[in-house]
């Protein structure tokens, strides 16, 4: 597959860095998933050697949307409306084809009132969070219509089960096959008529987050970030971060109320099917390069060290003593890349934009850091690389290679297998949308329900029967 021609007039036109297989929205859905799985807010200088056993994850090691729900209506009451079942919603935004587009709910100081403040880092992940808020609230309204005698606690529990099941289905059958090698996924999980079985070899139990996933493999998304995005027809192309602080509208940085015309048109970020539609912006290739704007990101308040994201990722791997990519590949029994196949830089075919790891840093010959190895492995899977140069046309989709695919697939599938309430273990827990675009279209097109709402939690009816969840079976992606 020949790379698209570079248009020098705009970073947002089709160019050689784009991945024609993955729409741009999946970059930020991946970030949304990451924030659901991992959180460590302790101070970190990135240099003090740290034992993996000393790591603390403040998120549950489950795909359970605790970043959306917090500790629930009792433990995180500030996230919820007065009835204790609907989540707070933000101000309406214009500019989108979705007339119900909304900002995140915010305090009078502009702080987002959500389960994980990191989902306000940029306008795109904030928009995804807002869509899941609306999806939850619409699901609550549906449960109320179908089971009007339920107590508020029962309504919330039923709605959360439906939302989480839909989310898990999208992670497993929409997101994962776009980023990982389907052959690896099939070796880890089989789906026969809706009955899912697993074959986990790396992580037989994912009750704790694998460090290789959190610190290396799942950071591939940094390479997918585009230089510029158009969120709707009214707003010009903008970078994720411009280097300016406190000036809403010049970039897509969050942590403040969104400009009123920043409603996101999701048809620019997700396609309805496996085929990428003409107007959908594409992610950048999963390769060993990141866009310049990510080197300008502000430091987390808990961290010291360099602002450059690539350097931070490498320091974090070294701090935790992660094995090299070559060592992990050997342990998995997959082919180990030669040093001349490990390109650091853009996978465009331009030899001036990439260099072998051994030429860049001779001390890394034969022992490439796992994060960099996984990114370079993606390039070496999509293209034939010989003596530090891409040879011939693209031969495979730009997804994770054998090592990256195995770590990410086993983590996601292992998390679900370890959760007795997941869709892997509860067969009727299935969503109605097969892709994120389908879900967001459903949310956008849903008419608001005019209802009296629920009574306050302490006066809700008790003893009502639990609802039966009856969503239609999904069409599995193969």
Which residues does each predicted region cover?
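Terminal regions of secretory-pathway proteins
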Residues: 1-118, 122-123, 141-478
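Active-site nucleophile-adjacent alpha helix/oxyanion-hole segment immediately C-terminal to the catalytic cysteine
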Residues: 133-141
């Amino acid at each position: 597959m020949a790379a698209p021609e570079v248009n020098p007039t705009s970073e947002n036109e089709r160019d050689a860095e784009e991945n024609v297989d993955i729409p741009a929205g999946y970059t930020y859905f991946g970030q949304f998933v990451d924030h659901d799985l991992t959180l460590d807010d302790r101070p970190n200088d990135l240099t003090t050697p740290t034992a993996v056993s000393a790591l603390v994850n403040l998120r549950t090691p489950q795909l359970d949307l605790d970043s959306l729900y917090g500790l629930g209506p009792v433990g995180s009451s500030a996230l919820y409306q007065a009835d204790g079942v609907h989540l707070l919603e933000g101000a309406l935004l214009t500019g989108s084809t979705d007339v119900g587009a909304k900002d995140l709910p915010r305090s009078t100081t502009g702080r987002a009132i959500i389960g994980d403040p990191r989902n306000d880092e940029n306008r795109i992940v904030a928009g995804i969070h807002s869509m899941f808020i609306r999806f939850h609230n619409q699901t609550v309204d549906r449960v109320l219509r179908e089971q009007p005698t339920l107590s508020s606690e029962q309504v919330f529990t039923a709605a959360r089960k439906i939302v989480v099941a839909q989310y898990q289905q999208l992670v497993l059958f929409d997101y994962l096959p776009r980023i990982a090698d389907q052959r690896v996924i099939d070796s880890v999980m089989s789906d026969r008529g809706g009955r899912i079985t697993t074959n986990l070899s790396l992580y037989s139990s994912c009750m704790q987050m694998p460090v290789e996933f959190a610190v290396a493999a799942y950071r591939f998304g940094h390479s997918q970030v585009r230089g510029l995005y158009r969120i709707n027809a009214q707003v010009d192309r903008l970078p994720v971060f411009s280097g300016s602080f406190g000036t809403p509208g010049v970039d897509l940085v969050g942590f403040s109320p969104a400009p009123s015309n920043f409603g996101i048109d999701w048809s620019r970020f997700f396609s309805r099917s496996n085929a990428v539609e003409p107007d959908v912006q594409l992610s950048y290739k999963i390769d060993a390069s990141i866009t310049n704007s990510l080197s300008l990101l502000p430091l987390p308040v808990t961290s010291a060290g360099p602002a450059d994201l690539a350097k931070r990722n490498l320091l974090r791997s070294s701090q935790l003593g992660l094995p090299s990519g070559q060592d992990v590949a050997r342990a998995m029994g997959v082919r180990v890349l030669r040093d001349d196949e490990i390109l650091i830089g853009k996978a465009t075919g331009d030899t001036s934009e990439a260099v072998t790891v051994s030429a860049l840093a001779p001390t890394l010959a034969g022992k490439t850091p796992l994060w960099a190895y996984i990114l370079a492995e993606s390039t070496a899977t999509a293209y034939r690389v010989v003596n530090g140069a891409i040879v011939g046309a693209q031969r495979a989709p730009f997804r994770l290679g054998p090592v990256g695919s195995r770590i990410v697939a086993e983590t996601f599938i292992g998390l679900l297998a370890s959760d007795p309430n997941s869709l892997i273990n509860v067969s009727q827990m299935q969503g109605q949308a097969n892709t994120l675009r389908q879900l967001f279209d459903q949310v956008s097109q849903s008419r608001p329900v005019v209802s009296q709402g629920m009574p306050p939690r302490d006066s809700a009816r008790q003893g009502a029967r639990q609802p039966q969840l009856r969503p239609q079976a999904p069409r599995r992606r193969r």
